[in-house]
Amino acid sequence: MKCIDKLLSLLLVACLGLGLVSCGSESTDQTSYDLETTSYQYGITKVNNISDVSFYGSNLCVTDQDNFGIDQVDSQVAGAGGVFNLATGQCTYGQNLFGKMYPASTTKILTCLVAIEQADLDTQVTVSAHAADQTADSSVANLAEGDAMTLKVLLYGLMLRSGNDAAIAIAETIGGSEEGFAKLMNEKAAALGATHSHFVTPHGLHEDDHYTTVYDMYLIFQAAVQNETFLQIISTPSYDVSYTGADGQAKSQTWVSTNRYLNGKESAPAGFTVVGGKTGTTYEAGYCLVLYSYNDQNQPIISIVYNSDCTLNLYYLMNELLYTFGEAPS
């Protein structure tokens, strides 16, 4: 037993000696990781000068606070909200920023972004029986089985009319199924840092396991508004669409935006120009709105209200948020 103890002691001393050698300055100099050259060499970055590297999150509005500014507005009419100044990189208002929320049809922001990035906008989409089979109270683009149009046209039905039929048709075309497309949605959300979200449908009809947070939706939306096609779609008040029915005959209709700032039913505060956004409503999610606008200093603002108790209060609080927290810093 003593021999074993002695042997272990000798081995321990030897290991410590090796450890001390490995911690010496000469060895460190020879093996140290050079972020600037090694990242370029191994393809981690695409630039060979560290000053040119754009780090993830460097242009994002960042906060670790869940609630701030809620006493300055009528926040009690909603479950969560946030205001983000993209010019200054500041989150100027937060209400339950990181709390789990049901997004309803604001889900379609991610659906639209994934579709734009994953497929050719000229792809022909034919509406399936499953996509066309919606309940009477479902938000639809009034599509029938066999209707055919390009993906780009269908995206207007998704974002303006908030068509659940359009969402399913898009998902089936790109992902093979709703489940396959949801996988793409979750991959994109994770890539954007929206790690407290999980999506199971392309439309946002209630599922217990389909959720996000105000901050995660900000991360998704700020990426989406950098896409010109996405901006073009969400800023359109109404869209006259022509497409082909299952019988080969031409069909047409007009899709009007559900965003009350765009359809003329609500006005933004003086000095603000609304570009567009996405509405959403279910019993569980309440009344939701994700909005992109500019203040009088031409600074882009993202503002979000989730789980409001009615349409009137949804837009009332949104205007309060813009007026109180969307102005340029003095």
Cite the ranges covered by each PLM segment:
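Bacterial peptidoglycan biogenesis and beta-lactam-recognition machinery
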Residues: 116-124, 175-198, 214-245, 263-270, ...
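Active-site-adjacent loops and short helices of periplasmic peptidoglycan-processing enzymes
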Residues: 26-215, 224-225
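Bacterial N-terminal signal peptides that target proteins for export
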Residues: 1-11
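Structured C-terminal helix/loop/strand segments within mature extracytoplasmic catalytic/sensor domains
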Residues: 4-6, 20-78, 86-93, 97-100, ...
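Generic alpha-helical structural context detector
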Residues: 156, 160, 168, 172, ...
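Extended amphipathic alpha-helical segments with heptad-repeat/coiled-coil character used for oligomerization
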Residues: 249-250
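Bacterial N-terminal signal peptides
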Residues: 11-19
